[in-house]
């Protein structure tokens, strides 16, 4: 055992040589001792090596074309939004790696500014799903926050730092990994200020939240309460740098299209109005011509808009797109329900007319792709209730009448096996 002095009373660390009086703890092994300081140093070395191993190299970073192709496998339509997101995400992570290379090289690096993303478009068109799919592809921590739950510091509600806590939790409290994650803030249009002019009175859930978000959007060293909730002076904080966190903020922005049309001179009613069918109006990209001045008029403050330089818009899905969503993606609803029925030994089939009827109902309800599952549940509920208790069903066929007129699906009976036929004849 490592000892100091002739008395043999003091033990010392076998690695750094410090005595037990110079360190907080000394841990004994078979014939050796190690102090808490040496343990901390070992942990730091291991963490650095693991972080270097986990960093995605630039040649491994998927190119914009590859990102878009990956999104195609999960999200139907929205081609413009996919291209915009693919380029923005590629440039964002290229910027992070450029910063790391710049620290290692002797040449003075060019500082690349962060490009957060603003997504505009109606509900149920794939805004959230696009962001989730991106995070899955890149294997980075991903967190979703609701802007309507946020309030300015000091008021009842969530602080903006709680958004960062969700990201840290998604990274299993690995702060270094969380610092390169993606945060998706939904319903951002609901925190627009009530009027175009700056408010004299305090708007704690609107303009106040926009002001509070500015620093973390731009990049700052934030102090996050580890258990969430409000900050108090006696708790320890998690420090996280948001410089390399990609923020995607999204909202439906109902009424913004009218502001855009007023500016560019398009008329929807009266003499000189552009005559278009309802289908054309529904699938038009109303936000294609959006400008910062339109967003300011809607109620976003200029500083907030300035931190969201990339704008991607999604459009209402037409019937053809909704039918494809039902059957084509890797996690399509038809595939999900087919698998559920297969687990009970029953084949499930949808006719093309039935899929079109489901899509038509989703369009009439105005819920977009998000409403497809609710309609499928309503249609399949009677058979999902009965079939697990029956062993005489081979196949269930869902037709147009099943969806439109609430007629029960067609049930194809299972042919008895040879053993069953022999038992009956006996």
From Swiss-Prot:
Subunit description: Component of the ClpX-ClpP complex. Forms a hexameric ring that, in the presence of ATP, binds to fourteen ClpP subunits assembled into a disk-like structure with a central cavity, resembling the structure of eukaryotic proteasomes.
Name assigned to this protein: ATP-dependent Clp protease ATP-binding subunit ClpX
Claim: Zinc is one of the keywords in the record: yes
Domain ClpX-type ZB, first and last residues per copy: 1-54
Keyword match Chaperone: yes
Family: Belongs to the ClpX chaperone family.
Gene: clpX
Job of this protein: ATP-dependent specificity component of the Clp protease. It directs the protease to specific substrates. Can perform chaperone functions in the absence of ClpP.
Pfam families referenced in this protein's UniProt entry, alphabetically: AAA_2 (PF07724), ClpB_D2-small (PF10431), zf-C4_ClpX (PF06689)
One cellular-component annotation, GO: HslUV protease complex
CDD domains (UniProt xref): RecA-like_ClpX
GO terms of molecular function: ATP binding; ATP hydrolysis activity; ATP-dependent protein folding chaperone; protein dimerization activity; unfolded protein binding; zinc ion binding
Binding residue positions for Zn(2+): 13, 16, 35, 38
UniProt binding sites for ATP: 122-129
Keywords from the UniProt entry: ATP-binding, Chaperone, Metal-binding, Nucleotide-binding, Zinc
Top-level lineage group: Bacteria
BP GO terms, sorted: cell division; proteolysis involved in protein catabolic process
């Amino acid at each position: 055992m490592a000892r100091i002095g002739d008395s043999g009373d003091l033990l010392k660390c076998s690695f750094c040589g410090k005595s037990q009086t110079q360190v907080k703890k000394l841990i004994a092994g078979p014939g050796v001792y190690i102090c808490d300081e040496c343990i901390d140093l070992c942990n730091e070395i291991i963490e650095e090596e693991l972080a270097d191993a986990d960093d995605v190299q630039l040649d491994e970073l998927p190119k914009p074309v590859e990102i878009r192709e990956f999104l195609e496998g999960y999200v139907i339509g929205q081609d413009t939004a996919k291209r915009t997101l693919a380029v923005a995400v590629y440039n964002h992570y290229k910027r992070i790696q450029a910063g790391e290379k710049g620290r290692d090289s002797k040449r003075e690096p060019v500082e690349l500014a962060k490009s957060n993303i603003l997504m505009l478009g109606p509900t149920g068109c794939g805004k959230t799903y696009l962001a989730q799919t991106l995070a899955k592809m890149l294997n980075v921590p991903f967190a979703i926050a609701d802007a309507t739950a946020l309030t300015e510091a000091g008021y009842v509600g969530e602080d903006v730092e709680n958004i960062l806590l969700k990201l840290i939790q998604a990274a299993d409290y690995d702060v270094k990994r969380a610092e390169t994650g993606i945060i998706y803030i939904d319903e951002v249009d609901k925190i627009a200020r009530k009027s175009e002019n700056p408010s004299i009175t305090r708007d704690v859930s609107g303009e106040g939240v926009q002001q509070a978000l500015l620093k973390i959007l731009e990049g700052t060293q934030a102090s996050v309460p580890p258990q969430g909730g409000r900050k108090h002076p006696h708790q320890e904080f998690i420090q996280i740098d948001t410089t390399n966190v990609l923020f995607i903020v999204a909202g439906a922005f109902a009424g913004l299209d009218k502001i855009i049309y007023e500016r560019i001179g398009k008329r929807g009613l009266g003499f000189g109005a552009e005559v278009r069918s309802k289908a054309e109006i529904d699938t038009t990209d109303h936000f294609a011509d959006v400008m910062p001045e339109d967003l300011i008029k809607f109620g976003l403050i200029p500083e907030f808009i300035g931190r969201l330089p990339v704008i991607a818009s999604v459009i209402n899905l037409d019937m053809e797109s909704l039918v494809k969503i039902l059957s084509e993606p890797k996690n399509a609803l038809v595939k999900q329900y087919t698998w559920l029925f297969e687990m009970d030994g029953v084949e499930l089939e949808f006719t093309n007319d039935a899929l079109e009827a489901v899509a038509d109902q989703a369009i009439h309800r105005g819920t977009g792709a998000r409403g497809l599952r609710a309609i499928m549940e309503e249609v399949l509920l009677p058979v999902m209730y009965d079939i697990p208790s029956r062993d005489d069903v081979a196949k269930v066929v869902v037709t147009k009448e099943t969806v439109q007129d609430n007629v029960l699906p067609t049930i194809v009976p299972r042919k008895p096996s040879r053993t069953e036929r022999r038992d009956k004849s006996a």
